[in-house]
Amino acid sequence: MKFLTSIWTSIALIVLFLGIRVLDPSFIEQTRLNTFDQYIKSLPDKESDVVLLNLGEETLANYGQYPFPRHTYAQLISDLRNANAGMIVFTIMFPEADRFGGDEVFISWVNNNGIILSQDASSRGRSDSAPYVGTATLGEGDAYDFVPEYKGLVTNLPELETAAWGVGLINSKKEVDNITRRIPLLSQINGQLYPALPLEVIRVLQDKKSYSLKADYDGIKDVMIPPYDPIKTEYDSSIWLNTNYTHKEYEYGYDALPNLNGQTVIVGLTASGLASQIPTPQGLFSAQELQASALQTVIDGTSISRPQWTGLAEIGLILIGALLIVSSIYYLSVWIGAAVFFAVVSAYSILVWYFWTSSGILLDLSYSIIVYIISFASSAFNNFYIQFKLRQQIKGQFSTYLSPDLVNQLVKNPELMVLGGERKEMTFMFMDIIGFTPISEAYKEQDDPEGLVELINYYLDTMTK
């Protein structure tokens, strides 16, 4: 039992929790992601420059059964051009020929008309290649070692992709809880790098022929499209999304389109039962709403990142903070340990908030605080248990030999017990108790010498007060 209440037990507990953090099971990762969600939700709400054109229930009522004939999409492009739209982006894909024979008209409206189409990287994709834009790699790393790899593509009709100004992927990064928080800016299929849809939109807007990226041995650092600042990414080219945007939305065939003043328009399906809803920390998003948030995140230069060093830094800070808490309790006192605990928690929280507000770097607050609390609670419990057992031991050893007042003094302050005794000025009182012999003999006959000691202590206490 003595070992279980020693400092080594608390240290072993810290090592156990550090081991769990290194293994990083799914429930720990989920807790961390939920914490990051709260950080991102703290960002101020902003109005996006991207306009959404939805194909919803009213659109179906006006244009009939979905999928629409391609000449309907040609008319949609015409209406957007009359509304002075800028870049027109489709999150709808057109992999098959139109059963109504409207492909030729649609292609003519897509051709050289500021249209960007979508692709989907998938293991079930029937294509293993598509038109792509070259990528220049800077640095000593190989991007192909880090970006997500897929076996196939869901593409559009080749004539459409040739006519469009750009084509981008609409994939997101798979999370442990299936909530979309990140998208990879680059993916590889059949040995080629393909851009995400937001990246392709920016390239076309800037009239650039290619991208450039920087990669080191530990992953991709950033993706660049001048004149924008480098887009900071995670090691696999993923970026965190700011979903705190509000977008102007119109339903095609129902809402009158205003003068769009050259704004980028993303077209997508929202009709119930046809459109898939994407779970995000802010709720369910449509495909075009998610892509609009991703595009606006990049345009605004919102830097949300979790560099690879953050995990190691968190483990180191957990170790240092927990050891400070445990040591202060065992070697000083519980009250000093409580002060150290609050100081460590406050300092770590300030550090996390500083990195987030100044650089957009995500440091996990939740797991560290949990370990600090458990370290403090276990050490404080051990300390109280040790003190409790010591008081019990003092009472058991001295209650039959010393007066209750003196025993209570020793219980409150065990340091009063000094080996070898101590020097004090003392006053002695000699007395003779009348009838003491028969009293002591009575206790002897009752086999209760302790009772006699208790009686004498009571008598002497009363006489000396």
Regions found by a protein language model. Give the residues of each.
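Non-transmembrane functional regions of envelope-associated proteins
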Residues: 2-229, 260-334
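Short gly/ser/thr-rich secondary-structure transition/capping motifs
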Residues: 34-36, 248-253, 408-413
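Substrate-access "cap/lid" subdomains that shape
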Residues: 213-256
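Feature representing long, continuous alpha-helical segments
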Residues: 293, 297, 322, 392, ...
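Transmembrane alpha-helical segments that form the functional core of multipass membrane systems
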Residues: 304, 308-382
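Juxtamembrane or sensor-core-proximal signal-transducing alpha helices
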Residues: 373-404
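Cytosolic juxtamembrane regulatory segments of multi-pass membrane proteins
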Residues: 400-419
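Catalytic NTP-binding/metal-coordinating core of nucleotidyl cyclase/transferase enzymes
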Residues: 418-465
